[in-house]
């Protein structure tokens, strides 16, 4: 299988579903992660232009740990809007490049505007990318306008699981250590979350995985729910 995980910022995927993606790589899947935004505003002290470079390096390091390809959506923080063609076409390009069998992204009811905008853009772009006669106006990755497949969408957990009720779980007990190592590659964000949100970032993520584990009889787990609309459903179990 080819799996595309699309997160708003570098580290969103590591927080919500990197344990699952690591298991996908281990079973032989090709996994591509797209960070839609550069993450350039995620620090109290480091200026945006400098932070953009730091976070790109952190994301590449994290992806390499699990054998995951990392690509970028071409936005900066809080500049992701879900109501214009340019934004949608940037994700059409990513989806046509990846040609996935499954897309994982943010829940539409997540906590901040970049996350909810990405959820809407992925929903729109995943259909648009399948149209043979649709000409993408923002092609950086895909070689041409070859359409992508119709693809199920799974929504990953929200931060701290707020307002999210999983309909499926993945046991990540054997990849939780790798998940935390990938997360800790994002050193700038460990500091940011402590200073801005007042939390111990790795501890929060581990605790949330333990909580989902309690819900499904595993030591650690990640939760997902499927996008239930026409052409997005499937009877198959696609996750490990």
Can you say where each PLM-predicted feature lies in the sequence?
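Active-site rim/loop-helix segments in enzyme catalytic domains that contact anionic ligands
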Residues: 1-98, 225, 236-237
């Amino acid at each position: 299988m080819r799996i595309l995980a699309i997160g708003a910022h570098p580290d969103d995927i590591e927080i919500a579903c990197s344990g699952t993606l690591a298991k996908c790589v281990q079973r032989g899947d090709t996994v591509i992660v797209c960070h839609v935004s550069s993450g350039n505003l995620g620090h109290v002290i480091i200026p945006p232009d400098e932070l953009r470079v730091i976070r790109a390096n952190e994301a590449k390091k994290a992806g390499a740990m699990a054998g995951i390809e990392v690509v970028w959506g071409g936005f900066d923080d809080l500049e992701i809007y879900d109501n214009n063609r340019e934004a949608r076409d940037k994700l059409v390009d990513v989806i046509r490049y990846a040609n996935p069998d499954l897309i994982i992204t943010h829940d539409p009811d997540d906590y901040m505007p970049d996350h909810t905008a990405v959820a809407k853009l992925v929903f729109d772009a995943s259909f648009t990318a399948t149209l043979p006669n649709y000409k993408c106006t923002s092609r950086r990755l895909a070689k041409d306008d070859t359409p992508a497949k119709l693809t199920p969408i799974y929504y990953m957990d929200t931060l701290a699981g707020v307002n999210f009720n999983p309909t499926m779980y993945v046991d990540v007990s054997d990849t939780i250590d790798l998940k935390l190592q990938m997360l800790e590659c994002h050193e700038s964000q460990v500091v940011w979350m402590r200073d801005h949100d007042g939390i111990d970032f790795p501890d929060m993520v581990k605790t949330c995985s333990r909580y989902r584990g309690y819900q499904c009889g595993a030591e650690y787990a990640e939760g997902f729910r499927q996008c239930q609309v026409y052409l997005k459903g499937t009877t198959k179990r696609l996750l490990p």
